[in-house]
Regions:
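A short, hydrophobic beta-strand-centered structural micro-motif
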Residues: 41-56
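Charged, amphipathic alpha-helical segments and their flanking helix caps
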Residues: 1-31, 36, 52-177
């Protein structure tokens, strides 16, 4: 389910933001270490990542179904040739979007959405600045926006193993969304 939710968030943001950003990506540590200089060339852009499961509560009296609460984080980044404030507020040029506008657009596109999945509606969480700094001629700004949702997972009976059904020559999938 986690992969399906992350892909649905990426697709909704890609469709909704359109040419406002250069792309919507899965986050894989691009802001860590020396990769930052390369990532800045993609700004304005958005990254989506699964931030973790924060709770699993039994949903039935037999404790065979659990409501799982998961968090997803959307990173928005932009740069401006000028001050650090310009990277947040945007500028006069079409490509000078600004991280504040990106944050507003991402929240508008995601809050209260299920994206056609069997999940709870996305709830907004914290929004925080990851960093704002001057890099040579450009100023950059990156913010993280948290979203929460829930879904249900069924537990196997004690001692049981998943038993996939196989028809014909189709490969059995034990673990699937």
């Amino acid at each position: 389910m986690i992969a399906s939710i992350e892909q649905a968030i990426k697709q909704r943001l890609s469709d909704g933001l359109g040419q406002m950003v250069s792309g919507v990506h899965t986050y894989g540590g691009e802001f860590d270490g020396e990769g930052l200089a390369q990532v800045v060339n993609q700004f304005p852009a958005v990254w989506v990542m699964f931030a973790g499961i924060t709770d699993s509560e039994p949903h039935d009296t037999r404790r065979t179904r659990y409501q799982v609460t998961g968090h997803f984080t959307v990173l928005v980044g932009d740069r401006a040739s000028g001050s650090e404030a310009d990277s947040r507020f945007g500028g006069l040029h079409r490509n000078d979007v600004g991280t504040y506008r990106l944050m507003q657009a991402v929240r508008l596109l995601l809050i209260n959405q299920t994206m056609g999945l069997c999940i709870g509606r996305l709830k907004p969480g914290k929004a925080k600045s990851l960093f704002s700094k001057q890099m040579e001629l450009d100023a950059i700004s990156v913010f993280a926006l948290d979203f929460e949702t829930h879904w249900f997972e069924d537990a196997l009976r004690d001692g049981d193993w998943p038993r996939p059904t196989v028809s014909g020559e189709q490969q059995a999938q034990v673990y699937a969304d």
